[in-house]
Amino acid sequence: MLMDEYEENKDMCPICKTDRYLSPDVKFLVNPECYHRICESCVDRIFSLGPAQCPYKGCDKILRKNKFKTQIFDDVEVEKEVDIRKRVFNVFNKTIDDFNGDLVEYNKYLEEVEDIIYKLDHGIDVAKTEEKLRTYEELNKQLIMNNLERSRTEIESFEQRQKFEKEMKLKKRLLERQIEEEERMNKEWTKKEIVNRLSTTTQDINETIEGVKNTVKLKKSSARRKLEELNRVLKNNPYFNSNVNVQNSRLKDAVPFTPFNGDREAHPRFTLKGSVYNDPFIKDLEHRKEFIASGFNTNYAYERVLTEAFMGLGCVISEEL
């Protein structure tokens, strides 16, 4: 049964004309072979007995029922591109670590992957591109499997980290609320206690108030102790620390070679004390009008000299290369 491609109403099956307005539960499926939208009922009816030709006019693709999947995106072109990307990235799954941090080579690799995706998505040299994909998969089977396993491990680690942080934040929120409630109750107790003590003692008012406040300070709540402990746990979060270390390592590796070893230091190795230095020549310059007008400052000169003196200390060329 061949039907014209129906694009006028995205909420209607082009084969049986089932409308989502009359049948809110209608479910549309697509097959990665051609990405033509068909409702689930038509898929069951047409493809239950085995593979059959796509019912769209002009489409000669042979479809199988087990290949149909729920359409996620409204635009089938987006659906198609996402599926192609998933398939290609499952094969071309190298990361920057596989290039020893070489960003140039990694970018070339990503560009090659994007070329493959573009050709498959737009139907350019499909047979040749598919052959290239198969050849690469056969030659790099072990590397692909290793990267898939590493990716699964990273995803599991990420999920564990998310779960851990979510639980800790929830506990922290509950403890903070408990502390707020205790502080409110302590304030009420303080007011009542001050009134009670003043009515039963001849002690100075200020001393009485101070005594009550000291009593409250000594009553350190268990919730506050738990919150402090929780903050220590969050601070020493192994997931957070490992993530920061990886990022710092990558940033350090990305810094290009420099023979100076000092031009990339965030904090200088010296402390500038302008009043201590006495250079007659520089001192004379700060009193001359033309230098004052240009914004000259003696500290700039001293800072440059000290930077040049300290730059390069601790630099071992053989270790830098």
From Swiss-Prot:
GO terms for cellular component: transcription factor TFIIH holo complex; transcription factor TFIIK complex. Transmembrane segments: none annotated. It comes from the Eukaryota. The modification Phosphoserine is found at S157. The modification Phosphothreonine is found at T258. A zinc finger (RING-type) spans 13-60. PROSITE patterns: ZF_RING_1 (PS00518), ZF_RING_2 (PS50089). GO terms for biological process: DNA repair; nucleotide-excision repair; regulation of transcription by RNA polymerase II; transcription by RNA polymerase II; transcription initiation at RNA polymerase II promoter. GO terms for molecular function: cyclin-dependent protein serine/threonine kinase activator activity; zinc ion binding. InterPro entries: Cdk-activating_kinase_MAT1_cen, MAT1/Tfb3, Znf_RING, Znf_RING/FYVE/PHD, Znf_RING_CS. Keywords: Metal-binding, Nucleus, Phosphoprotein, Transcription, Transcription regulation, Zinc, Zinc-finger. It is found in: Nucleus. NCBIfam families: cdk7. Present with 3050 molecules/cell in log phase SD medium. Acts as a component of the general transcription and DNA repair factor IIH (TFIIH or factor B), which is essential for both basal and activated transcription, and is involved in nucleotide excision repair (NER) of damaged DNA. TFIIH has CTD kinase and DNA-dependent ATPase activity, and is essential for polymerase II transcription in vitro. This is RNA polymerase II transcription factor B subunit 3. The gene is TFB3.
